[in-house]
Amino acid sequence: MKIAFFNPQGNFDKKDSHLTEHPDFGGQLIYVKELAKAMGKMGNKVDIITRKIIDKKWPEFSGDFDYYPDAENVRIVRIAFGGDKFLNKERLWDFLGEYVKNIYRFYQKEGFPDFVTTHYGDGGIAGAMFKKLTHIPYSFTAHSLGAQKKDKFKNAKDAEERYRFSIRISAEKVAMKYASFIVTSTQQEKEEQYSHNEYIDVYPEIKDKIFVIPPGVNTNIFYPDDTDEYKFSKLPIIVSSRLDPKKNIEFVIESFNKYLKDGFELIIVLRKKPEEYTGYERQLIEKAKKAKGKFLVITSQKELAKLYNSAAKHRGIFALTSHYEPFGLAIIEAMACKLPVISTRNGGPVEILDNGKYGHLVSTHEEFKEAALKIKDNYEKLSEESYKRVMEKYTWERCAKEYLNLIEKENVILPEFFEKQMG
């Protein structure tokens, strides 16, 4: 089967350039890449359709095609639209018609895909436009929905000017309506986000085609091994989120500073040297410095996995305390290395940790302290149970199989003997 992934924002290349360094290069890109690779390993031909960028600040994304060395069936296809320069996702809405028309022209030359998976509202509306042109069915995976983000802003006018919520939400509703099926990562996302008042006019007709398919973890990178390359003076608390207000790293710094400095050390992972950051990010770094936090510059997932394994050897903890976390891919990456987790009560982590069975959910500094001490006293048991949880429920192979089962219901799958006759 030939499957196209529509992901206009951010970009992809074999080096994972800029991954986690920019809001448009976050967990969604990891999701798309890993799901595409898992489908490719099952014999499907997969195209990730993104944007061609000719910009000195983003030199990695100027080629028409790119490939992953470990995924022979996966191709990155960059389509020109919206000019040459890099554009944040909020500015792409004006050019999605051009994106779709150029995808159509591209596939006219080499044959169209059997199915399209679309990602975020921009990919979703592109899938709907593409379906109108070709009648090729698509699925919609929002990753996050505009209504929930809109609710967090007090000044509606400023929020609309910056994030263009009216356009985003209208695109999401069309994507939902015409999708063959909709994928969410958690039950909470299915039940609460899609039933929001902004979507109430389409929810009754889409609710039965929403399926919960948890994402996976790359077990070729994140797995327990004997790595112990990092040394710690005390029990490490690891934070590896983007330095973004949404990730609420201040909460971890404050909890550590108030209660845990004697027995633990705080390690914050950065993508570049501390002095190279500015604005809010620099303020956060200075706050961590005052609390005696330490910093490690890590620029690859493989190196991050080494850190997690070393931290687990030293009875460490992984912390992710976002104000809201749609899923929590970083959590399962840590758990796959047997590194126990303290996380936010808001969003996907509640389901990953099964309401606290496989890790600790917190909302106050006191709860963070208690969680850290409980992990310390029950380390081996929680470490093993965390790992088993990931292996049983959160692999990309399982995620891909569930997608493909739904895709096959939308397509005529012929035996190879007859498929060849169709040319």
From Swiss-Prot:
<comment type="function">
    <text>Plays a role in sucrose synthesis by catalyzing the first step of sucrose biosynthesis from UDP-glucose and fructose-6-phosphate.</text>
</comment>
<protein>
    <recommendedName>
        <fullName>Probable sucrose-phosphate synthase</fullName>
        <ecNumber>2.4.1.14</ecNumber>
    </recommendedName>
</protein>
<keyword id="KW-0808">Transferase</keyword>
<dbReference type="InterPro" id="IPR000368">
    <property type="entry name" value="Sucrose_synth_GT-B1"/>
</dbReference>
<dbReference type="InterPro" id="IPR001296">
    <property type="entry name" value="Glyco_trans_1"/>
</dbReference>
<dbReference type="InterPro" id="IPR044161">
    <property type="entry name" value="SPS"/>
</dbReference>
<dbReference type="Pfam" id="PF00862">
    <property type="entry name" value="GT-B_Sucrose_synth"/>
</dbReference>
<dbReference type="GO" id="GO:0046524">
    <property type="term" value="F:sucrose-phosphate synthase activity"/>
</dbReference>
<keyword id="KW-0328">Glycosyltransferase</keyword>
<dbReference type="Pfam" id="PF00534">
    <property type="entry name" value="Glycos_transf_1"/>
</dbReference>
<comment type="similarity">
    <text>Belongs to the glycosyltransferase 1 family.</text>
</comment>
